[in-house]
């Protein structure tokens, strides 16, 4: 795991709240008042993030303002389906299968490809050791064997959304493809679009909606999961904005802008 991944893990819940609670315990003797505030804040945060209404309040703004149609004059030329997670299967060696989120994206992407008659690129690298099958290969197998619609391209190197965009652009742009549908979860679209546009692709969202209980005020494990995704995406979006600003446009895009 990289230092960047470790830092991101520590600043999303529950690790961030656990760290606050640990700090509170450490300070109990030296600064009891501050310790009580830290412990109380950690407990209140854990309770709040387990409430469906709070979880949705964190997640839904990620979906606001997403365009629902391609920009004029730039119709998508391909469908890009991003991988999500895998489930590890018991057995000899490292075996994985497509997880629920990846399957939902795959189903939505196949439906879009059939509706638009556009070619498909699936994107996702290995999750685990070097002997684990890349997610994109599993997605391609499922498209061919289950849906009878094999993808035209398989991008099997990426480990992050940023790399999804970078490596997909490297495959598609030499083929003359500069505009794509991006199929991923609605809460993930904002960050994915930022990355794809940074690498010179006109990206139109094709979001997979995720049902969240809007009015629930009873704590639950699902709300914790939603809160985690929300924090992860907000942090990732800020990270990608900063990364794009620091990196500037890729060389090919910078050169074309200069020529123009």
Label every PLM stretch briefly.
Residues 37-52:
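Hydrophobic membrane-insertion alpha-helices, especially the h-region
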Residues 238-260:
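Extracytoplasmic/luminal low-complexity segments enriched in Pro/Gly and acidic/polar residues
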Residues 52, 56-224:
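A structural signal for short, hydrophobic/glycine-enriched beta-strand patches
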Residues 2-7, 54, 58-62, 231-234, ...:
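Hydrophobic alpha-helical segments of integral membrane proteins
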Residues 7, 19-20, 37-40, 230:
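Hydrophobic alpha-helical transmembrane segments
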Residues 22-23, 47, 238:
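Hydrophobic residues within the alpha-helical transmembrane core of Major Facilitator Superfamily
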Residues 28-36:
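Membrane-interface helix-boundary motifs at transmembrane edges
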Residues 1-28:
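Membrane-embedded alpha-helical segments of integral membrane proteins
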């Amino acid at each position: 795991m990289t230092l960047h991944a470790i830092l991101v893990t520590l600043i999303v819940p529950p690790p961030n709240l656990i760290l606050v609670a640990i700090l509170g315990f450490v300070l109990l003797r030296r600064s009891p008042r501050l310790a009580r505030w830290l412990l109380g804040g950690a407990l209140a945060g854990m309770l709040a993030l387990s409430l469906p209404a709070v979880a949705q309040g964190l997640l839904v703004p990620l979906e606001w303002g997403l365009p629902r149609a391609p920009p004029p004059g730039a119709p998508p030329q391909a469908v890009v389906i991003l991988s999500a997670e895998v489930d590890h299967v018991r057995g000899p060696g490292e075996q994985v299968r497509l997880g629920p989120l990846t399957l939902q994206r795959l189903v939505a992407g196949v439906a879009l490809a059939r509706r638009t008659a556009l070619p498909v690129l699936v994107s996702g690298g290995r999750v685990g050791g070097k002997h684990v099958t890349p997610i994109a290969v599993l997605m391609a197998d499922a498209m061919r064997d289950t849906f009878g619609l094999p993808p035209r391209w398989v991008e099997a190197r990426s480990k992050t959304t940023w790399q999804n965009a970078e490596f997909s652009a490297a495959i598609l742009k030499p083929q003359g493809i500069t505009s794509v549908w991006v199929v991923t979860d609605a809460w993930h679209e904002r960050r994915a679009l930022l990355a794809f546009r940074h690498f010179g692709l006109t990206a139109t969202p094709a979001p997979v909606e995720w049902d969240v209980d809007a009015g629930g005020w009873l704590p639950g494990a699902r709300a914790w999961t939603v809160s985690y995704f929300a924090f992860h995406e907000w942090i990732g979006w800020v990270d990608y904005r900063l990364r794009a600003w620091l990196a500037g446009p890729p060389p090919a895009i910078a050169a074309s802008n200069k020529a123009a």
